[in-house]
Every structure is written in structure tokens, then in C-alpha cells.
């Protein structure tokens, strides 16, 4: 289970799958994603089950990007990794995305 940002950066590598449990855009909740690129600046992810999806097609096929923020913008609780647009208020109002790392790969 990921407990901090350093562990998350080591865990999210190409091929890692995760499920979105909360998002600033509610239509993305429940979506299963697969990391295509991860580096020191952030990570890109696609929806492997939907090759024509706008998330998958974004950034020339690398997928949607989430840039790493500093540690105070993150919260790690009960296997859920959450990033917020505030380093002080970790509430739904400031949520960018929450997700859990999946044990098995998605398609």
C-alpha cells in the first residue's frame, strides 16, 4: 500500500493500472486507467478498454497527464492516493483526483 508521494512515484511505472475513485469531473469516477509514461514530472494514462476515448487519444496517444505536485498537495489513506489543488484543504471541493493502484492489469 502506497503511503507517501515518494512511494507513489516508484510504484507508478509504465503498465501500472489504477482505478479512479474520485475526480473533479464525476464522469471519470470508476474509470480504469493504465500508465503509459511516468517520469520525474508526472505520468500519462489511458483507458485501455476504450482505444477511441478522448483520454486515450490525448497527448498523441500517451493519454491524459497528471503532473506531480509537492507532497502537501497529496493525501494517502486506506490505499487511496488523492491529489488536491490546495496544500491546506484536502476536501472534495479541492480534489483533482483520487485513485487506487490495482493488483491486476487492465486489458
Label for each model-derived stretch:
Residues 16-18, 33, 98:
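Generic hydrophobic/packing signal
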Residues 12-23:
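Tryptophan-anchored aromatic micro-motifs
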Residues 74, 97-104:
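Structured surface patches comprising rigid loops and adjacent beta-strands/short helices at the edges
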Residues 1-14:
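Mixed-charge, Lys/Arg-rich low-complexity intrinsically disordered regions
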Residues 24-31, 36-95:
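Acidic, low-complexity, intrinsically disordered interaction modules
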Amino acid at each position: 500500500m502506497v503511503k507517501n508521494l515518494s512511494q507513489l512515484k516508484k510504484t507508478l511505472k509504465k503498465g501500472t493500472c489504477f482505478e479512479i475513485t474520485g475526480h473533479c469531473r464525476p464522469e471519470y469516477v470508476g474509470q480504469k486507467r493504465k500508465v503509459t509514461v511516468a517520469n520525474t514530472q508526472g505520468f500519462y494514462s489511458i483507458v485501455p478498454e476504450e482505444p477511441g476515448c478522448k483520454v486515450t487519444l490525448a497527448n498523441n496517444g500517451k493519454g491524459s497527464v497528471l503532473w506531480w505536485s509537492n507532497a502537501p498537495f497529496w493525501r494517502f489513506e486506506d490505499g487511496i492516493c488523492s491529489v488536491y489543488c490546495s496544500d491546506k484543504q484536502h476536501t472534495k471541493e479541492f480534489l483533482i483526483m483520487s485513485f487506487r493502484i490495482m493488483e491486476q492489469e487492465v486489458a
